[in-house]
Amino acid sequence: MIITFNKYQGTGNDFILIDNRKLIFPKDNIHLIEKMCSRKFGIGADGLILLENSDTVDFKMVYFNSDGNLGSMCGNGGRCIVHFANFLNIINNNTIFEATDGYHKGFFVNEMISLKMNDVSKIDLRTDYLYLDTGSPHHVEMVNELENFNVEEKGAFLRNHLYGIDGSNINFVEQINDNCFKVRTYERGVEAETLSCGTGATAVAIAMFELKKTSFNHIQLKTKGGNLSVEFEKNNLIYQNIYLKGPAKLIYKGDWEC
């Protein structure tokens, strides 16, 4: 069996994208997905994304973590699949698509892709961190000297010991100025730090506004893989009209024989 794939990246968060409108990809083959995502034995990626037909909107996004299991919403992956759908001539410059957490709008904006995220109404504020769900669960914690912080060790500990078997993504944040923050994220399912996390950047932007670290509702996030921006409105304790914006690029195409 030959599987044609497209390798994408959005601020260093990289994905294998596959056109599965004919439903030929073996989605229950966890080992295959894990091997394709392996950086030593496969293509190498933080996750694998299938584009499938939808009965109600332009297309459906099915996301797998690099461990082969179905994942929750992926913001950078969502931006990449919008680019992929345009590449396949399914859409022009805007779209509505279906994902595991509901429907999302996507737009091309000056070679960037802006993705509308779902509303956020529940934020758990603790002494040292915040917890919220932006399509995926996120722990947000401020630290000093983020550049030298041991994200892998502390992230793995919190992911496994604080959040149990289901786990959570863990974000560490350092403020740069009034509306700019540096972010590093340990992602569950990848079980490592990634160069960027879109739902994590979204969670950080909302968390910083909630903590009154910023009064801006258009926030810049600097990740190891590049820059993202998040804008939103807060109405009656609910964060709405949340948009994640950043680049999405096709790196190469190829065929996988299995």
Predicted segments — roles?
Residues 115-128, 153-158:
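Active-site glycine-rich loop that binds ribose-phosphate moieties when present
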Residues 132:
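Short glycine/Trp-rich loop-beta-loop segment that forms part of the substrate-binding cleft
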Residues 1-110, 140-258:
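A glycine-rich beta-to-alpha transition motif near the start of alpha/beta enzyme domains, typified by
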